Amino acid sequence: DALSPDLTAQKIFKKISKSEVPIKQILLNQKLIAGIGNIYASEILFDSKISPLTLGKDLEISLIMKLIKSIRKILKKAIKYGGSSIRDYRSTDGTLGNFQSNFKVYNKEGKKIGGDKVKKIVQYGRSTFYCPKLQNNK
């Protein structure tokens, strides 16, 4: 589970250190980390300054630690705001989520952020939004 205290950088590093798969796709793998969807994956990677194109094998333990911190930060914030209502999502009580008003990159193609522009690419059939200059794994 993405918010579990059992999720550690060492465990993730061990599972992805030889992976030729981009980190965005790794985040969407529910068998590895349950609870991260497409929208949150883009937001998490932006928050951690990691390119969605980075292969699992190229992530150092220090970047995985940043990634886990961002996973917890973004998902807790999303829960606080009731999730994201992009189309017709409603919570169990029928209310709309409001986290979409906090998106930094998702669905913001062309928006200027810190001297960069949000770019949209498609990975494994899913839209990915990121800032190439800002998400440089540093």
Predicted feature locations:
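Basic, nucleic-acid-binding surfaces and adjacent catalytic neighborhoods in DNA/RNA-processing proteins
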Residues: 11-138
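Compact, glycine/acidic-enriched structural inserts
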Residues: 1-6
